[in-house]
UniProtKB/Swiss-Prot annotation:
PTM comment: Phosphorylated on Thr-12, Thr-54 and Thr-197 by PknB. Thr-12 is the primary phosphorylation site.
List of residues binding Mg(2+): D108, D222
Known function: Catalyzes the conversion of glucose-1-phosphate and dTTP to dTDP-glucose and pyrophosphate. Involved in the biosynthesis of the dTDP-L-rhamnose which is a component of the critical linker, D-N-acetylglucosamine-L-rhamnose disaccharide, which connects the galactan region of arabinogalactan to peptidoglycan via a phosphodiester linkage.
Keyword annotations of the record: Magnesium, Metal-binding, Nucleotidyltransferase, Phosphoprotein, Transferase
Note: Identified as a drug target.
Cofactor: Mg(2+)
Residues that coordinate or bind dTDP-alpha-D-glucose: G8, K23, Q24, Q80, G85, D108, N109, G143, E158, K159, V169, D222
EC number: 2.7.7.24
PANTHER family from the UniProt entry: GLUCOSE-1-PHOSPHATE THYMIDYLYLTRANSFERASE, GLUCOSE-1-PHOSPHATE THYMIDYLYLTRANSFERASE 1
Gene: rmlA
Record-listed Phosphothreonine modification sites: T12, T54, T197
Cofactor binding note of this UniProt entry: Binds 1 Mg(2+) ion per subunit.
Protein name listed in UniProt: Glucose-1-phosphate thymidylyltransferase
Native source species: Mycobacterium tuberculosis (strain ATCC 25618 / H37Rv)
Subunit structure: Homotetramer.
């Protein structure tokens, strides 16, 4: 399975901050926002990852992440010139996906929960599509899924004025290779975008879309506004201070997955030793 992180867009809801920097490079407490979706893919066992961003922001991501070798993964880059919709990621990333299945995660979405990585690994050999549902108070801001009495998905809508449920679809999607041709066959919506909801609708119509409600205790945070960005930082800060463990550290995930060894972890830690981040990496070895 290949992975794609979509980190494009102009971040207008965070202007003027994002007039000078990509939203996905902003800090969420003690690390760049992009680390959170990156570790989500890594915990799912995905090592071949393409990051899609704007031509203007691509150099910043490359400076931060490089080719991913220090994390035991392969990171490549592609650009989306205009924010023409989430589904365009599969057209842009077609060569990266090749004949494989693919997971798409949005660069401003944070997922946290017990056993999340183990749960996501189930989709490595997917046939069809798999998306998730999460109860929210303001579903009109998201794609929305409606469930029937037996828990089967009945309908999907993109940012409906009158939602049929409170279940939003978070920015994490798994598909088989058919998604490339499905995305290529889409037409722009009334909003002028190639909608991911339309991709999901095709799979739903074919009876090949699995919709799972995220397990109780799992947190999904969208960081697209000033308040939600601060809420996410507060959430991470509270978790880390109470537990003494950090959240969404790519080096830690790579080390625990066996993709980098102790010496590689030490080398990375030394480069960051002046911050608590580097010290935390060194403490991982002492604890184990």
């Amino acid at each position: 399975m290949r992975g794609i992180i979509l980190a494009g867009g102009s971040g207008t809801r965070l202007y003027p901050i994002t007039m000078g920097i990509s939203k996905q490079l902003l800090p969420v407490y003690d690390k760049p926002m992009i680390y959170y979706p990156l570790t989500t893919l890594m915990m799912a066992g995905i090592r071949d990852i393409q990051l899609i961003t704007t031509p203007h922001d691509a150099p910043g991501f490359h400076r931060l992440l490089g080719d991913g070798a220090h994390l035991g993964v392969n990171i490549s880059y592609a650009t989306q010139d205009q924010p023409d919709g989430l589904a365009q990621a599969f057209v842009i990333g077609a060569n990266h996906i090749g004949a494989d299945s693919v997971a798409l995660v949005l660069g401003d979405n944070i997922f946290y929960g017990p056993g999340l990585g183990t749960s996501l690994k189930r989709f490595q050999s997917i046939s069809g599509g798999a998306i998730f549902a999460y109860w929210v108070a303001n579903p009109s801001a998201y794609g929305v899924v409606e469930f029937g009495a037996e828990g089967m998905a009945l309908s999907l809508e993109e940012k409906p004025v009158t939602p049929k449920s409170n279940y939003a679809v978070p920015g994490l999607y798994f598909y088989d290779n058919d998604v490339i041709e499905i995305a290529r066959g889409l037409k722009k919506s009334a909003r002028g975008e190639y909608e991911i909801t339309e991709v999901n609708q095709v799979y739903l119509n074919q009876g090949r879309l699995a919709v799972e409600v995220l397990a109780r205790g799992t947190a999904w945070l969208d960081t697209g506004t000033f308040d939600s960005l601060l809420d996410a930082a507060d959430f991470v800060r509270t978790l880390e201070r109470r537990q003494g463990l950090k959240v969404s550290i790519p080096e830690e995930v790579a080390w625990r997955m066996g993709w980098i060894d102790d010496e590689q972890l030490v080398q990375r830690a030394r480069a960051l030793v002046k911050s608590g981040y580097g010290n935390y990496l060194l403490e991982l070895l002492e604890r184990n």
